[in-house]
Amino acid sequence: MRLLNISVLGCGRWGTFIAWYANKIGHNVMLWGRENSRNYIELSETRKNDYLKLSEDLELSNSLHKAISFAEIIIISISAQELRSFANQLNLIDEIQGKTFILCMKGLEATSGKRLSQVFSEIVGKNTNIAVWIGPGHVQDFVNDIPNCMVIGSENIGITKKIVQEFNSDLIRFYYGQDLIGNEIGAATKNVMGIAAGMLDGLNYSSLKGSLMARGTRELSRLVTAMGGNDLTIYGLSHLGDYEATLFSLHSHNRKFGEAFVLGQKFDKLAEGVSTVKALKELSKQYDVELPISNALYEILFESKDAKDTLEELFLRPVKFEF
């Protein structure tokens, strides 16, 4: 590993952790946030949030131009639905040319169903390198030295290997992603299954999570195949490997959202899976792939169908072979 200048754009829970991690393993790090954001103000005043404390040698900045100019590698961790408008902002900065961008989000563009690397590439792809950083793990575990495995994916295997070499450690073991389509679809849709798992918890049907895991991976592997990816990727770290952290963990925002939704309770944290449910509705049409679980969630979230009635309808679907 060589010492790099790295900027992390986005100072939410995950972005702040990535900055903390990159600094911890020896890189020079700048963390960017919007000047008036609650997270940035808190970090500027205290250098800590609810999960971790930043080292004094990690620089904070609210200047996007400064953050881009500083770094060789730029990591983006913002809401997936804000990526297109944010990329348009970045595209106004001449210094983005030749940089390597790593997208550290798990989502799809709700209106188009496009993968985040597609969205970003459309706007700033020329003369830049684009990769994704995905897989299981919670900030609360990592900062307590509980290790996990993750994936780096890119259309350029040389870029993938370089990033893994610079970020691999005894806290996070990275694997080379070989299927960008499958990795991105898998990472985004595990949040959808997390919402479904939370709904099962709220309905006292938690024992159905095993069936959700089996059938959820099956329907999403069909989608990945239709999109030109490798169906086996769904059974790797980006999707199935992230189920423990998403379907069972008390830290999972998507699981907690699903549970709160069926119980009629308020939940004010970001649950990226909600927008991904919309994207899957679009992809199901585009690729003519049946996605019964994802479609059921769409009906519950956006058409006000009763969750328990919708689950019963899934059970009344025609009997078929498992594989």
Regions found by a protein language model. Give the residues of each.
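NAD(P)-dependent Rossmann-like dehydrogenase/reductase catalytic/cofactor-binding core
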Residues: 197-198, 225-235, 240-323
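Rossmann-like NAD(P)(H) cofactor-binding subdomain of soluble oxidoreductases
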Residues: 54, 61-69, 73-145, 163
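Internal alpha-helical scaffold of NAD(P)-dependent oxidoreductase catalytic cores
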Residues: 82, 89, 119, 123-129, ...
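NAD(P)+-binding Rossmann beta1-loop-alpha1 motif at the extreme N-terminus of oxidoreductases
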Residues: 1-62, 70
